[in-house]
Amino acid sequence: MTAQIIDGKAIATTITERVAKGVKLRIANGLRAPGLAVILVGGDPASQIYVGSKRRTCEAVGIHSKAFDLPETTTQDELLALIDKLNDDPDIDGILVQFPLPDGFDQTSVIERIKPDKDVDGFHPYNVGRLAQRIPLLRSCTPRGIISMLEYIGTEFHGKHAVVVGASNIVGRPMTLELLLAGCTTTTCHRFTTDLAHYVKQADILVVARGKANFIPGEWIKKGATVLDVGINRLEDGSLAGDVDFAGAKERAAWISPVPGGVGPMTVATLIENTLFACNEFHSQ
């Protein structure tokens, strides 16, 4: 068996095209384009690349992107004051703060300062809580993007055992909630999990967000499983690798997402989808 590839780039394109149509429809009806504020503190090269990708995607679909590139010397109070200002700006539907922030910032306070109806990253405790209560509004971008990928390939969720490796607030925890909402039986593995292989080998749907290249050996993959690899790791030769041994896993899985070109594009596509949703649902004018 050789796995079919889940083409995140192609699926993301269908989402961005749908968002672009939604933006055009708003404008045709005499409404303003959605607005997204993107805040970057400091000059971390990886963060600059991610922010650039988000801004370009916004422009491509007609969303008004407002950039705030702040120096590394910015204080927590200054950042919170900017968020307060954007919370009150009627032309801004979403506020995105690029993480990680430089040392000295309290990330939780920053997340909680963003109004829940402008939290297009889906990180605010209010939005995560709504997902846990099965009444989601703005949903965390990477987990929601993965659900979109699974839906696109026709995944049957009910009765399936979904295993999530990683328990971060950004991916692992909301991913478990999304899969639970979809009807899966879920297991979340983390650094205190003993006998990780035991759980991975049971997974009909496996989502790995560990941040370590080739962390999951191919021989652990259940035959016929669907594998979503969130990791993106740069190897010594400069190439990129996921958290799953792709070469080994694709010989056992039915479906697998590649790195790059898998989950990554879906995160950005879901961000702009959230921005249009916030505009239409909460701030439409």
Swiss-Prot record:
Positions that bind NADP(+): G166, A167, S168, I232
Highest taxon, organism lineage: Bacteria
Gene: folD
Name the record gives this protein: Bifunctional protein FolD
UniProt keyword annotation of DNA-binding present: no
Gene Ontology CC terms, in alphabetical order: cytosol
Oligomeric form and interacting partners: Homodimer.
Lineage, broadest ranks: Bacteria, Pseudomonadati, Pseudomonadota, Gammaproteobacteria, Alteromonadales
Record organism: Psychromonas ingrahamii (strain DSM 17664 / CCUG 51855 / 37)
Family (UniProt): Belongs to the tetrahydrofolate dehydrogenase/cyclohydrolase family.
